Amino acid sequence: MKKILALVLVFALAVCASAELAEEATVLTHEQYENAEVDSPVCVETYVQATQSWWDNTITVYAQSEDGAYFIYKLACSEEDAAKLVPGTKIRVTGTKIEWSGEVEIGDPTFEFVDGDPFIAEAEDVTALLGTDELAKHMNEKVAFKGVKVVGTKVEGQDGEFPFLYSYDGSGTREDNGVGADLYFTVEANGAQYSFTVESYLCGNDTDVYKAVEGLKIGDVIDCEGFLYWYNGANPHITGVTVVTPAE
């Protein structure tokens, strides 16, 4: 009887060990994540680069590893753990690969902290890739745009053009939601125009970048940094703006 119990125990331990190994094997490289079908389960290990505001036990995370980046939408997270999701922190994320208006992201995600040295991504200059299919390969990465020109944006029902808008249609204010409406501005590069956004839950109205965009003038030439979000085309979430040549 004791031998039978011992064999049962050994078998149970072996099953547990196999399950743990199988679970570890499900962690995908970024290439495997890219090749996974939309709506399929995914598990990745990556590093926090920035977060939006925590709310209702969720937080949206911009994450990146040496081999690629992820937009992790509404990560289930306590307020206590949210405070620990500082840039460089390594996490393992499990969720579903989803696509919305061209943006590929991880939905319904959960996470756990993983031991490891911190990693902070450097912004890659992708200015030359604007308007090319190659740009999408950098989706969600920390990127830079150099020497782009601010052009005017029109608002329906109003005369003139504006260097930026509070909300996509100009209907917002800097007081919305306590952090201000998202800021939208248009830049010209490589002979075409692109819409850039300051996502206020990422960089609110008290941040340097929000104030910098509020101070832009049509014709300013600027350098920008941010995360390459996608919405029916490139729509970067901008985290830094520097005017390099003021408008005349």
Put a short name on every predicted segment.
Residues 21-248:
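OB-fold single-stranded nucleic acid-binding module
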Residues 4-19:
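Sec-dependent N-terminal signal peptides
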